[in-house]
């Protein structure tokens, strides 16, 4: 079987970019069981309620839903079990310091295959208040309208 190359997306957490201000992103490996790998190969996972937490100098991923493998038997995994994330020691130390600072959390943004290995993109993030969410939405709409108008002007279609 030829070795896989490139990046193939499994799941995205679009809600995280709306609910949080993303300060920094990291790529981490995951410690998975056999049936979890097979379920991910089938493209089934949900990052919606997921978060990462530091415990005993390690970073653990909580509440990420990888459903049971349909062809699995008694060896199937628990869908929402906590999973260990694999990062370099320096990255872990940096994240420990920043999350203990207060107001910052680790949220998963994307789950994907990279060269045949399951990877997760996590973000160091600060939660947004509801008025911040509305403000960010208004800014995005204004930028979209400006670019749309600039496109019209370039094409010579004035309103």
Curated annotation (Swiss-Prot):
Keywords: Cytoplasm, RNA-binding
GO biological process: trans-translation
Gene Ontology MF: a single term: RNA binding
One GO cellular component, as annotated: cytosol
Superkingdom, taxonomy of origin: Bacteria
Gene3D superfamilies, per database record: 2.40.280.10
UniProt xrefs under InterPro entries: SmpB, SsrA-bd_prot, SsrA-bd_prot_CS
Signal peptide location: none
HAMAP family: SmpB
Similarity annotation: Belongs to the SmpB family.
Biological role: Required for rescue of stalled ribosomes mediated by trans-translation. Binds to transfer-messenger RNA (tmRNA), required for stable association of tmRNA with ribosomes. tmRNA and SmpB together mimic tRNA shape, replacing the anticodon stem-loop with SmpB. tmRNA is encoded by the ssrA gene; the 2 termini fold to resemble tRNA(Ala) and it encodes a 'tag peptide', a short internal open reading frame. During trans-translation Ala-aminoacylated tmRNA acts like a tRNA, entering the A-site of stalled ribosomes, displacing the stalled mRNA.
Protein name, UniProt field: SsrA-binding protein
Species the sequence originates in: Frankia alni (strain DSM 45986 / CECT 9034 / ACN14a)
């Amino acid at each position: 079987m030829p070795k896989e190359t490139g990046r193939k997306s499994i799941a995205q957490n679009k809600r995280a970019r709306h609910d949080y201000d993303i300060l920094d992103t990291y790529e981490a490996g995951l410690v998975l069981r056999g049936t979890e790998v097979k379920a991910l190969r089938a493209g089934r996972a949900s990052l919606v309620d997921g978060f990462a937490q530091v415990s005993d100098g390690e970073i653990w991923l909580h509440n990420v839903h990888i459903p049971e493998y349909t062809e699995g038997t008694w060896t199937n995994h628990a869908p929402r079990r906590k999973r260990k994330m694999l990062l370099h020691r320096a990255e872990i130390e940096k994240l420990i310091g920043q999350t203990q600072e207060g107001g910052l959390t680790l949220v998963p943004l994307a789950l994907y295959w990279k060269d045949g290995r399951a990877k997760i993109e996590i973000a160091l993030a600060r939660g947004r208040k509801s008025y911040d969410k509305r403000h960010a939405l208004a800014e995005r709409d204004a930028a979209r309208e400006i670019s749309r108008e600039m496109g019209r002007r370039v094409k010579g279609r004035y309103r």
